[in-house]
Amino acid sequence: MTIAQEPTALNFECETGNYHTFCPISCVAWLYQKIEDSFFLVIGTKTCGYFLQNAMGVMIFAEPRYAMAELEEGDISAQLNDYAELKRLCEQIKRDRNPSVIVWIGTCTTEIIKMDLEGLAPKLEGELGIPIVVARANGLDYAFTQGEDTVLAAMAHRCPDKAPVAEAEKNERNAVQKLLNFGKKKELVAQEESEYVDHPPLVLFGSLPDPVVTQLTLELKKQGIKVSGWLPAKRFTELPVLEEGYYVAGVNPFLSRTATTLMRRRKCKLIGAPFPIGPDGTRAWIEKICSVFGITPQGLDEREAQIWAGLEDYVKLIRGKSVFFMGDNLLEVSLARFLVRCGMTVQEVGIPYMDKRYQAAELAMLEKACQEMGVPSPKMVEKPDNYNQVQRIYDLKPDLVITGMAHANPLEARGINTKWSVEFTFAQIHGFTNARDILELVTRPLRRNNNLKDLGWDKLVREEAKI
C-alpha cells in the first residue's frame, strides 16, 4: 500500500450550512414495528401526513399501528379544545387497537403553537388507563435518526425502578408446565445461569431488528455477560428495570439524548464504547464492556479475523479508493472508521451534529485506524454547507460520495458515484455477521459502474436527430 501522506490528528471544523435530512417523525417507521404493543399518534399538519405516507407507504390494508392527528385551523386558532380532541382520538385508538402504550409524536407545528402535550398526557392517561408517552420528534432536530433518540429518552422515564412482583401469579399459571418439566427445569436453569460471570446488571439501548438483538446478546453471552434488558423492548410491558448503579451501553451513535437521560435521571453508569458496526467496532464494543466488568475477552481475535477473511471479496473492490461523507444520519463516524479499516481513504466526514462526549471512543478509534492503516485522517465538518461541500467534491474527486437523497441524482449527473446514506439506517449493519451488508451497500455503485463499463455504456452520447 502506498502512503499518500503522514497520518494526522482529526481536524474539526464547523460550517453554517442548513440541515438537509428527513424529518425525525420518520422514526415511527421502524419503532412501531419494534415495539409490538404500541400505537404511535403523530400530531401535526397535512405536510406531516404526506411525508409519512411517502416514507412508509399508505399501508391501508395492513392496519398499521400509527396514525396522523391532523391539526386544523380551529386547533391553531385555539377555537377547539386540545384535550377534548386528543381524548376523542385516544378513546378510538383504545377501542380499535387496545395498545399497551400510546406514543404522542410532537411536530414543528405543536412546538410553534405551544401545544402542552406533556401537560395533557398525564390527565388523559389517568382517564384512559393506558400509558401515554410524549416525544417531541420534530423537524427542529439535526438529523432524522434523532427521532428515535427522543422516543427512547421519553421511554427511559417509564422503565420500572425495581422488578415487578408478579412471579407468584406466573408460577400458578405455569403449574402444569412445571409438572411436565419436573426434575429437568431447575438443572437447565442452573446450567444456563452458571454460563454467566457475576457482574452488575447491563442494559443495552437502541432499536435494532430482533435477529441483530439476538446476535449481540449471544456475542456477550459467549464472554459470560448477561444482558438484563434492551431499551426499547419488543413490548412496552417488558421495558427493562433501571436501578441506580446499573450499567448501560448504546448501540447507535445518534442516541446521546437517551444516554444523558439514563445517566442524569436514572443514575445509570454509561459504558463509553465504540459502536458495534463492522467487525472492528463490534470487537471493540465487546472488549470495552468486558473491561468494565473485569472480564478477559475470549476468542475475539479469531472471530474478527474469520469475519475479515469472509469479507475479502468485497474489500478488494474498495481497497485504495476514496470516500466522501456529506452527512445525513449521524452514522458517519462509525462507517468512516470501518471503511478506513477496509483500506479506503476517507477524505471528509460531514456530520449534522457531533456529540464529542458520546462519540469520544468512536473518534479515538477512527484516529487510531487512520494511523495503523497509514492513511491521512479525514476532515471532520460539523453542520456542513452543501455548496462548499460540492466544491470540495469537485476538487478531491472521490471514488464514492455517501450522501442524502436530495444530492444523489445531481451528483450522479455530474459523473460522481453516490450511495444513499438513508440505506445504512434501515439495513442490518450491527454485529460481526452483518458487516457484509455494509460492504454490499458501499460497493454496489462501484460494481454497477464496472458492469456498465464492461458493456461499453460508460459515456452519454448526444446525437443529432435525423429527419
Curated annotation (Swiss-Prot):
Keywords: 4Fe-4S, ATP-binding, Chlorophyll biosynthesis, Iron, Iron-sulfur, Metal-binding, Nucleotide-binding, Oxidoreductase, Photosynthesis. It catalyses: chlorophyllide a + oxidized 2[4Fe-4S]-[ferredoxin] + 2 ADP + 2 phosphate = protochlorophyllide a + reduced 2[4Fe-4S]-[ferredoxin] + 2 ATP + 2 H2O. [4Fe-4S] cluster binds at residues 23, 48, 108. GO terms for molecular function: 4 iron, 4 sulfur cluster binding; ATP binding; metal ion binding; oxidoreductase activity, acting on iron-sulfur proteins as donors; oxidoreductase activity, acting on the CH-CH group of donors, iron-sulfur protein as acceptor. Pathway: Porphyrin-containing compound metabolism; chlorophyll biosynthesis (light-independent). The keyword Metal-binding applies. Its cofactor is [4Fe-4S] cluster. Component of the dark-operative protochlorophyllide reductase (DPOR) that uses Mg-ATP and reduced ferredoxin to reduce ring D of protochlorophyllide (Pchlide) to form chlorophyllide a (Chlide). This reaction is light-independent. The NB-protein (ChlN-ChlB) is the catalytic component of the complex. Belongs to the BchN/ChlN family. This is Light-independent protochlorophyllide reductase subunit N. The lineage of its organism: Bacteria, Bacillati, Cyanobacteriota, Cyanophyceae, Nostocales. The gene is chlN.
